[in-house]
């Protein structure tokens, strides 16, 4: 329903009450000063700071010494709040009202004044559960948009940090902030991000994933082509590398672009510990991912087609453990992997410590019982458990590891090691074809620029880094 404001205060009040009919949180407060100044104050109960409204808006209005004031004069001489503005149209007025501002209308002037009186409840800052660190800042984003922006400003006191707002999402009118550093982020990347955001046609945006699925490259790929984080220090670090970040109102998750494969093997505290320790940790993560994705398939392929590759004692031990089992090696491995994934999902959905306890105890009890009952073999249980544990070292690639694991497992069961090799080459070709906001997904896989080699599979000490650039050119020294 379109809203039109006039010079008549009573007509404006009636129009606002009609628009917010059957909404018990909508409050209208009429005021009139001894001099005859008549105003109406509108706000939504539960979204505002009532004390600020009483002291900074209503009290000055009832003490005004003039009988008529324009919106500009009201804002400059009466309202005692620094964040107040004359709103040019009703759409912006309603948006401000719904977001927790207080709107003031006066007799004789249809232009509303919006005053920042937000006072809704919010969660305090805490360390993100999914990005805990052993050393470094422990502050994480919250669901409150402006608080998240203040965390960025506090970490980077530079006017080159640009924060550009835009509303998306139709009914929800969700504010999305495009963050970049002027002079560091390539203009082409900023334009590409804005172009993708302008294609959003969602009726509502309630989480960062709504936007991520719409603007990322290759939504069918199991590899992440858009970075996600809940930590302000990570966002600032990626902005300094020349990337862009998106902060979405109502969610603690920030999106960063471009995203490359190397980023998935980097942890938050790699930059807060000695360089050699960080480099060793990164290499271990790479080995853990490869073990998690490849070893189950290699086990089945070797057991079914290439037993001559196994040491004799190992082959005899596996054969003895599998004697009398009802399932072939392939289905044994598939069943174990599925049970583990179900236990992991159940643990994630169960609240608190019960979930992690249930996953550990459930895996131990079921595995021991299955081996004791001669339903599954102990080597298969060991391999699945090792693959599951090593896969947890790279949480950003858990989905990719799962897809690769099952795909290569089927290929290895059908064609042996040749199937595993061909499947691995197909996944490598897929990685080569991926791009993230115009950048190759395997960028810096083999560093050709010094700025790239300073922080790739390992990193140099901070004394050896010059400028930590993500999109360095080959002509840079």
Question: Which positions does each model-derived feature cover?
Answer:
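Membrane-embedded alpha-helical signal segments
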Residues: 1-294, 312, 431-477
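Short polybasic/polar patches that bind polyanions
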Residues: 157, 198, 344, 371, ...
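Amphipathic alpha-helical protein-protein interaction surfaces
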Residues: 157, 323, 416-417
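Positions that flank functional sites
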Residues: 171, 254, 358, 385, ...
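Transmembrane alpha-helical segments that form the functional core of multipass membrane systems
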Residues: 246, 259-408
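Hydrophobic alpha-helical transmembrane segments of membrane transport and translocation systems
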Residues: 378-380, 385-477
């Amino acid at each position: 329903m379109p809203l039109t404001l006039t010079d008549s205060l009573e007509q404006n009040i009636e129009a606002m009450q009609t628009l917010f009919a059957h909404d018990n949180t909508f409050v209208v407060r009429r005021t009139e000063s001894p001099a005859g100044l008549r105003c109406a104050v509108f706000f939504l109960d539960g979204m505002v700071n009532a004390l600020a409204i009483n002291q900074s808006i209503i009290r000055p209005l009832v003490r005004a010494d003039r009988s008529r004031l324009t919106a500009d004069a009201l804002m400059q001489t009466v309202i005692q709040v620094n964040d107040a503005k004359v709103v040019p149209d009703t759409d912006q007025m309603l948006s401000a009202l719904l977001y927790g501002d207080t709107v003031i209308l006066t007799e004789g002037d249809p232009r509303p004044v919006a005053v920042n009186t937000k006072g809704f409840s919010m969660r305090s800052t805490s360390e993100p559960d999914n990005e805990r660190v052993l050393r470094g800042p422990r502050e994480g984003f919250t669901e409150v948009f402006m608080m998240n922006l203040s965390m960025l400003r506090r970490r980077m006191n530079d006017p080159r940090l640009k924060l550009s707002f835009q509303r998306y999402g139709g009914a929800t009118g969700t504010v999305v902030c495009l963050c970049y550093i002027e002079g560091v982020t390539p203009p082409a990347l900023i334009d590409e991000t804005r172009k993708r955001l302008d294609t959003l046609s969602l009726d509502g945006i309630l989480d960062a994933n709504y936007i991520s699925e719409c603007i990322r490259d290759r939504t069918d790929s199991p590899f992440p082509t858009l970075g996600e984080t809940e930590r302000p220090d990570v966002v600032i670090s990626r902005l300094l590398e020349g990337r862009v970040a998106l902060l979405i109102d109502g969610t603690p998750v920030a999106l960063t672009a471009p995203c490359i494969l190397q980023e998935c093997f980097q942890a938050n505290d790699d930059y807060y510990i000695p360089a050699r320790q960080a480099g060793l940790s990164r290499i271990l993560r790479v080995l853990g991912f490869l073990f998690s994705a490849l070893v189950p398939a290699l086990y089945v392929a070797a057991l079914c087609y290439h037993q001559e590759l196994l040491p004799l004692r190992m082959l005899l031990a596996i054969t003895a453990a599998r004697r009398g089992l009802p399932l072939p090696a392939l289905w044994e491995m598939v069943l174990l992997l599925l049970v583990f994934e179900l236990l992991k999902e159940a643990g994630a959905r169960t609240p608190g410590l019960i979930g992690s306890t249930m996953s550990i105890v459930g895996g131990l009890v079921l595995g021991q019982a299955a081996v004791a009952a001669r339903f599954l073999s102990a080597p298969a249980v060991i391999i699945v458990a090792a693959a599951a544990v090593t896969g947890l070292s790279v949480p950003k690639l858990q989905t990719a590891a799962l897809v690769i694991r099952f795909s290569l497992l089927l290929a290895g069961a059908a064609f042996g090691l040749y199937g595993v090799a061909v499947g691995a080459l197909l996944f490598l070709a897929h990685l080569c074809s991926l791009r993230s906001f115009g950048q190759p997904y395997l960028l810096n896989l083999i560093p050709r620029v010094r700025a790239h080699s300073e922080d790739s599979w390992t990193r140099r000490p901070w004394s050896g880094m010059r400028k930590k650039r993500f999109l360095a050119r080959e002509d840079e020294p």
